[in-house]
From Swiss-Prot:
Disulfide bonds: none annotated. Residues 74-87 have a biased composition (Low complexity). Residues 1-6 are cytoplasmic. Belongs to the methyltransferase superfamily. The chain crosses the membrane at residues 7-29. This is Probable methyltransferase At1g29790. It comes from Arabidopsis thaliana (Mouse-ear cress). Keywords: Glycoprotein, Golgi apparatus, Membrane, Methyltransferase, Signal-anchor, Transferase, Transmembrane, Transmembrane helix. Residues 30-378 are lumenal.
């Protein structure tokens, strides 16, 4: 900064000397002119030499440039401080930084070079490696959409509608059949029969239940048509299958955590969206009539991410659409102090709000079933 100031002062000094020389030259030329005018009225006015004018313009341009672009001391000081501390701090809101780290965005791929290198280490124009687990590791760490590859995805050798097991690559999973999954995970919906799906959402055993027939009646009474929905964390697509039988199209978001959830959804003739809960839903604004949040949406999601998630649901819901929280799990104190106020920020109408204690609760855990309707106009 001191060198810059010295250079500026030197230029100003040179400019001042040159200006004085030019002024003296011009003054002497003007005096000679008046003297010659007395002697002869026909004498012509002498002009300033071009090389002096060019030098003067050059000096003035340099002075203007330096004075115009000279950085303000306070600005330069703050800029230098920001440059020094950029690696340790930021002026961006903390919640935005948290979300940028947790929410899957493609730019996060560079944060995991080892996993990314392993994912992209394949032979072009051949079969893709068996790396389903690696894919989900990258997705959950923010590397989604995944980089494109020039290899062919693996498929079952002899798929058959009559044999559900033949539609799954079982090498990824501990169980090797749907019977194993039904026995090991009886409550996760791997019984793909339609009657099983219908019965799961038709019974009313407690205040936490919301049968589909009641849901459709509520919508009909409000003159609200249900045509398109999304089941967030919908597992094997049981809810989507039950709604399909009632001519309602429901997309299911799911992840294959040690079981073929996406394959199970597809075998029902439904669409599985292989996305985590943190991702912005790949759906246009204001086009969905219903969003159901299953048991995957609960208190284990970080609070800040949960708030972004709710507002993304609001983004895709149309005015008059419904948000259904089906057995949202949390501690009672957290529901009252954190989640209920967070949900209240949406400004939705409470059509149903039922809270019940967890049967074997030891720390005050509760379940919430809520049906909320988005305002028609903000």
């Amino acid at each position: 900064m001191a060198g810059f100031t010295m250079s500026l002062n030197l230029l100003l000094l040179v400019a001042m000397v040159a200006t004085n020389i030019l002024s003296l030259y011009h003054l002497s030329s003007t005096t000679n002119f008046f003297q010659s005018t007395v002697k002869s009225s026909q004498s012509s006015v002498p002009t300033v030499p071009d090389h002096l004018l060019r030098q003067l313009h050059t000096i003035r341009a340099a002075i203007n440039h330096l004075t115009t672009h000279q950085p303000d001391k306070s600005t330069s000081t703050s800029t230098s401080r920001a440059a020094v501390s950029s690696s340790s701090s930021s002026t961006a809101p903390k919640e935005l930084l948290i979300y940028s780290k947790l929410s899957p965005i493609a730019s996060a791929c560079h944060n995991y070079p080892d996993l990314l290198h392993e994912y992209m280490n394949y032979t072009p124009f051949s079969l893709c490696p068996s790396d389903t687990d690696l894919v989900e590791k990258l997705i959950l760490r923010g590397c989604h959409p995944l980089p494109r590859r020039r290899c062919f995805s693996r498929t079952p050798r002899n798929p058959s509608d009559s044999k559900p097991e033949s539609n799954v690559l079982w090498s990824y999973y501990s169980c090797k059949s749907f019977d194993c999954l039904i026995t090991k995970f009886s409550d996760l919906g791997f019984d793909l029969s339609l009657e099983k799906s219908k019965s799961q959402f038709s019974a009313y055993k407690s205040e936490l239940d919301l049968p589909i027939s009641q849901l459709l009646q509520i919508a009909k009474s409000a003159n609200s048509v249900l045509r398109l929905g999304i089941d967030v964390g919908g597992g094997t697509g049981s809810f989507a299958a039950a709604m399909k039988a009632r001519n309602v199209t429901v997309l299911t978001t799911t992840m294959n955590f040690n079981a073929p959830y996406s394959e199970a959804v597809a075998m029902r003739g439904l669409v599985p969206l292989h996305v985590p809960l943190q991702q912005r839903l790949p759906v246009f604004d204001g086009v969905v009539d219903l969003v159901r949040c299953g048991r995957a949406v609960n208190r284990w999601i970080p609070v800040t991410v949960m708030e972004f998630f709710f507002f993304d649901l609001d983004r895709i819901l149309r005015g008059g659409g419904y948000l259904w929280l089906d057995r949202f799990f949390s501690k009672k104190v957290d529901l009252e102090n954190v989640y209920a106020p967070m949900i209240g920020k949406l400004g939705y109408k409470k059509v149903k709000w039922a809270v019940a204690n967890k049967a074997d609760s030891k720390h005050g855990e509760v379940f919430l079933t809520a049906l909320l309707q988005k305002p028609v106009a903000r």
